[in-house]
């Protein structure tokens, strides 16, 4: 089962490294920070960079959440497995399916999507957003970002993914 670990936003990579160093690997199958690719213009050149898909959260795949949570106390950074009272709540099947379909690679990274502008419509031509245009709530062309509204952790959240709009047509 997959569980969400809440961490301080911007410290996902640091906490991830500390968990891998500190927590007994027998307690979990995998722990990761889902990411997305986007483009940034640096010194006039477009560079592909990555950023957290779910800022402030890590995902752990474990069948021993009690043992993992106990081991997680060894980590010096602020960490909390999401749950209610004394039980931990795993990600639902749709949440796991969404994450897995978007990040279907060993690095758990959502690749860059590309699109063209036809009149006042944006048409996705390639990438993971091709089958999920309905999730797009807004687009920032200048920053090559699409903002998605999804159900995750029992509530509606807005997240970003990379979207390069190549040219205008029509």
Question: Could you say what each language-model-derived stretch is?
Answer:
Residues 127-129, 139-144:
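Short, conserved beta-turn/loop elements at beta-strand boundaries and strand-helix junctions
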Residues 1-121, 143, 147-170:
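Acidic-enriched and Gly/Ser
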């Amino acid at each position: 089962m997959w569980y969400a670990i809440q961490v301080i936003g911007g410290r996902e990579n640091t906490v991830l490294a500390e968990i891998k160093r500190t927590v007994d690997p027998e307690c979990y199958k995998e722990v990761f920070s889902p990411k997305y690719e986007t483009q940034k213009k640096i010194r006039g050149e477009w560079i592909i960079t990555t950023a957290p898909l779910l800022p402030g959260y890590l995902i752990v795949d474990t069948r021993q959440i009690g043992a993992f949570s106990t081991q997680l106390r060894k980590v010096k950074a602020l960490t909390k497995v999401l749950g209610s009272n004394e039980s931990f709540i795993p990600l639902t099947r749709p949440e796991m399916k969404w994450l897995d379909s978007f990040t279907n690679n060993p690095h758990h990274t959502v690749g860059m999507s590309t699109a063209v502008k036809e009149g006042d419509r944006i048409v996705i031509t390639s990438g993971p957003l091709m089958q999920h245009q309905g999730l797009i709530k807004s687009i920032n062309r200048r920053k090559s970002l699409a903002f998605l509204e999804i159900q995750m952790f029992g509530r509606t959240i807005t997240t970003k993914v990379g979207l390069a709009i190549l040219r205008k047509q029509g």
